[in-house]
């Protein structure tokens, strides 16, 4: 009986594994009621136990979720009952349960994330680029048609030249791509999809007057990219895309066909290969054949995934990807004298600047903070690009004078608010009921969850970022994110923080005196009590005390509620930042 029972349990375990799957689909369409669509996904995915990512915008949906196959099939049936999803290609694949918790967490498959975004995939670079009209996207070719075109090109010369264009990132193309004799394959070797428009602009002549066959993982990236190519006009009309992406092609041609290697996927499977299981990837260090990303090794500088084989991989080692090496960053010493830096504008040796997300203080906005930090930005121009965003909580316009100020009200925002927070009135200015309290920051204990969700979207749409800089309440918000950094892997990734005139936010109060935050941090605040009339010196000092010994660098100045840009303070700021270049 015992043996039979064990056998039954094992059989059930295998059946459970066989019942698991991953579902991918997208649809570009006008969404008449976004709130209703959000409610549909919240209800359907939660009731069916689906985990993964759902991205919604006024222009459509992009979904990658996992769960029991029966649950996924039920979700598909529910979606198909809505005319919004007419013609949608639901790509459902059976697979094993997530076996590696770290990989599942990084891929977002340990929770359900439903977000409303501006772009289903972030095609726009910084500064923002107007997205091309999706109605102008390249013609869809089925897997069989795509294969036939490549097969014909192998046997005879076409009337027009044919090129293959891979719309994916470098870490994807390393382990798998289409290869065909007599057909040139263009690999942009980009870190992220938002770099593709610039590459297309710089390499347009390679595609002009030719038949361009585009492909990506599941098809969505080709929709926007092919429309962008076709928007260039005459000579770019013959741009085509593989419908259903590599996934549908491998389903049609299980042995791989013209696709060599493995298809990188953004879920716990990591990659999916053909029956041939050929390996085209290689170890970053020894160049031996290798294509397994499950160790999750990343470039120290840009955080892109890299391939490091089991023989070369040593815990604590630092890796520099081929792109950073190509642009000279891999030759930069880890410790530098900030006062004797070489020029950073020498052609191909130009190093990528650090990208730093800047969080303003309470009752400020991105524009005003950018203005206040103009001198800082100028002195860091060869080191860092500062990116400013408004906080999500809009505040009332408050005045204390006898009559309200005249002129247009510039919106003010906050990351954290008090429990009696009131949304702005439609009438404009509101008279203050009492004097402004210099200790009001101590009562700002609400709004963190909304701000955290907002930052996740900012990182997804405007990232990647190397670090976060926060001022006053913005520093408190940045510190709170640092405290949750391990829980936010894959959603909010950064390597350091700069906290100016900060204080301990309520999410970190329970950590007081524990020095448990391991994120490298630079703390800048006034050393003389009373000089900073907004945030007392001790509050900023206490915040620095939450960061682990060896992680926190402190710069104390003789001024008030500002970020100093004179020597020696600016030299100390540069010295900290140069560690990450």
Curated annotation (Swiss-Prot):
Domain called Rhodanese: residue spans: 158-258
Listed transmembrane segments: none
CDD domains in the cross-refs: RHOD_YceA
Catalytic center residues: 216
Matching Pfam families: FSH1, Rhodanese_C, UPF0176_N
InterPro entries listed in its UniProt record: AB_hydrolase_fold, FSH-like_dom, Rhodanese-like_dom, Rhodanese-like_dom_sf, Rhodanese_C, TrhO, TRHO_N
Superkingdom field: Eukaryota
Protein's name according to its UniProt entry: Rhodanese-like domain-containing protein 6
